[in-house]
């Protein structure tokens, strides 16, 4: 079994899989609602510019918002210290699976903070699913213990 995501759809873009969706990935400890105003502004600007409608999504990460909490097994297993060393990779797979299940091959991925970690992992594991990345207030290295 894989990690399940709760996808929040701001606009479905007419379900036109010839367009490229924008997937907004929230940070920790918030959920998709952090993107509400941004998604509305993005949609409104696209309409004003005459851009063909495209999907705008903001899936909740597991355990955030309406995101179901996966089992330890679905998360890739837990180390003796309680860490989930494969958790981020499994989440990246789940986001790409969601994209493909909707009939899209690529997305524009936007990640804030921990969402940036996730979309960098998507780029590493699934570069074919990336049309573009927007990294917001994030970094490529993991947080330190400090």
Residue locations for each model-derived region?
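Conserved hydrolase catalytic core segment
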Residues: 105-144
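Active-site glycine-rich loops that stabilize anionic/oxyanionic intermediates
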Residues: 27-30, 113
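Active-site loop/oxyanion-hole signature of alpha/beta-hydrolase fold enzymes
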Residues: 2-12, 37-110
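Short helix-terminating capping/connector loops at secondary-structure junctions
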Residues: 17-18, 48-54, 128-129
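Short beta-strand element of the alpha/beta-hydrolase
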Residues: 19-27
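Active-site loop signature of alpha/beta-hydrolase-fold enzymes
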Residues: 30-31, 64-67, 141
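Short alpha-helical
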Residues: 30-33, 37, 117
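Alpha/beta-hydrolase
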Residues: 25, 59-61, 136
């Amino acid at each position: 079994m894989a990690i399940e995501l709760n996808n929040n759809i701001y606009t479905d873009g007419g379900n036109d899989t010839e367009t490229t969706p924008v997937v907004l990935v929230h940070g920790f400890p918030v959920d998709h609602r952090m993107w509400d105003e941004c998604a509305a502004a993005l949609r409104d600007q696209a309409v004003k510019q005459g851009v063909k409608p495209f999907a705008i999504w903001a899936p909740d990460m597991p355990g955030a918002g309406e995101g179901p909490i996966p089992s330890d097994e679905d998360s890739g297993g837990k180390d003796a210290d309680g860490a989930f060393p494969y958790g981020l990779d499994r989440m990246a797979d789940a986001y790409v699976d969601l994209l493909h299940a909707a009939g899209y091959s690529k997305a524009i991925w936007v990640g804030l903070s921990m969402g940036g970690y996730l979309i960098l992992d998507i780029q590493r594991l699934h570069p074919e699913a990336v049309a573009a990345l927007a990294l917001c207030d994030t970094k490529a290295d993991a947080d330190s213990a400090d």
